[in-house]
Every structure is written in structure tokens, then in C-alpha cells.
Amino acid sequence: MTYVMSLFLLGLVLGLVAVASNPSPYFGALSLVGVAAFGCGVLIWHGGSFLSLVLFLIYLGGMLVVFAYSAALAAEPYPETLGSWPVVSVYFGYFFFVFGILYTNMVLDEEVWWGVSGEMDWDAVFRGDMDGVSLMYSSGGGVLLLGAWVLLLTLLVVLELVRGLGRGALRAV
């Protein structure tokens, strides 16, 4: 089970490095989807199944708006991919920086500082995200509906701004 959690965390770090290496917005959005998936996998592995589902859906809804906006503003004939030389060099630079810090801390500390603690206590019996579900549907339902409405409104505004044939506000840029 530790190997699966390590795989999720490795995918999370590699996805964050891929986002930070500044590829074209198309590939940056794809990397963000991977980061969201691996981050929600970490939450699921710690028992927050409903919380990870809600975060994944809300995050992907917000990313849809950001992706539509950035793809409309940065339409390039030859986008920088994750395999082009400048992006790969920055990617490996970040990768070796992150794992260099990890290796340095492992050598200097000589102890396992990344271990998960408290998994076998009584805290593992109680499901914290289920308390959040009851609060969300009782007193937090209005905020949930407001968030969904704002995301829908933002999506419609972005789609109106990037409408084709020169009628959109940002096509003249």
C-alpha cells in the first residue's frame, strides 16, 4: 500500500514539474489534469473519497474555463510541446532540483521524515469527509450552488469573449 501512495505522490510531483516547465497552454492544461488526478488519488488513499470527488469535479470545471481562455489567447501555429528542447531542459532542471533536495535531506537527516503517522490510531476509524458532506448539504448548500453558478457564468463569459469570426472581444488582440 505504501508503493501505491508513493506512486501517487511521484505522479503529483512530476505533474507539478511539468506545469512549472511552461509548455504551451494546451499541454499545461493536460499536466494540470494529471496533477488533479494524482492529488485526488492521494486523498482517496487517505480515506477522503467524497472530498476528492468533489474537489476533482470542481477543479476540472474551473480548469475548463481557464483552458478555454488561455487556449483562445495563446493560439500558436507551432506550440511548445513537452518534448521540445527548451521545455525538456527546464523540466529536468526542476526534476533534479526537487529530487536533489530530497536526497540531501535523506543523507543529512538519516531518518525517515516522510513517513505517514497516525494511521493505526483511533483517528483512522472516523471519516472526516463524511462530516463535511453533512455540513455541505445542510448549511453549506447555498455556497455550493453559488460556486456552481459562478463557474457556469464564467464559462459563458469566456465562451462569449472568444467567439469566432471577429465578433468576440478578444479576437482583435
Curated annotation (Swiss-Prot):
<keyword id="KW-0249">Electron transport</keyword>
<dbReference type="GO" id="GO:0008137">
    <property type="term" value="F:NADH dehydrogenase (ubiquinone) activity"/>
</dbReference>
<dbReference type="InterPro" id="IPR050269">
    <property type="entry name" value="ComplexI_Subunit6"/>
</dbReference>
<comment type="similarity">
    <text>Belongs to the complex I subunit 6 family.</text>
</comment>
<keyword id="KW-0496">Mitochondrion</keyword>
<feature type="transmembrane region" description="Helical">
    <location>
        <begin position="82"/>
        <end position="102"/>
    </location>
</feature>
<keyword id="KW-0812">Transmembrane</keyword>
<dbReference type="GO" id="GO:0031966">
    <property type="term" value="C:mitochondrial membrane"/>
</dbReference>
<keyword id="KW-0813">Transport</keyword>
<dbReference type="InterPro" id="IPR042106">
    <property type="entry name" value="Nuo/plastoQ_OxRdtase_6_NuoJ"/>
</dbReference>
<keyword id="KW-0830">Ubiquinone</keyword>
<dbReference type="InterPro" id="IPR001457">
    <property type="entry name" value="NADH_UbQ/plastoQ_OxRdtase_su6"/>
</dbReference>
<feature type="transmembrane region" description="Helical">
    <location>
        <begin position="53"/>
        <end position="73"/>
    </location>
</feature>
<feature type="transmembrane region" description="Helical">
    <location>
        <begin position="142"/>
        <end position="162"/>
    </location>
</feature>
<keyword id="KW-0472">Membrane</keyword>
<protein>
    <recommendedName>
        <fullName>NADH-ubiquinone oxidoreductase chain 6</fullName>
        <ecNumber>7.1.1.2</ecNumber>
    </recommendedName>
</protein>
<comment type="function">
    <text>Core subunit of the mitochondrial membrane respiratory chain NADH dehydrogenase (Complex I) that is believed to belong to the minimal assembly required for catalysis. Complex I functions in the transfer of electrons from NADH to the respiratory chain. The immediate electron acceptor for the enzyme is believed to be ubiquinone.</text>
</comment>
<keyword id="KW-1133">Transmembrane helix</keyword>
<feature type="transmembrane region" description="Helical">
    <location>
        <begin position="25"/>
        <end position="45"/>
    </location>
</feature>
<keyword id="KW-0679">Respiratory chain</keyword>
<feature type="transmembrane region" description="Helical">
    <location>
        <begin position="1"/>
        <end position="21"/>
    </location>
</feature>
<keyword id="KW-1278">Translocase</keyword>
<keyword id="KW-0520">NAD</keyword>
<dbReference type="Pfam" id="PF00499">
    <property type="entry name" value="Oxidored_q3"/>
</dbReference>
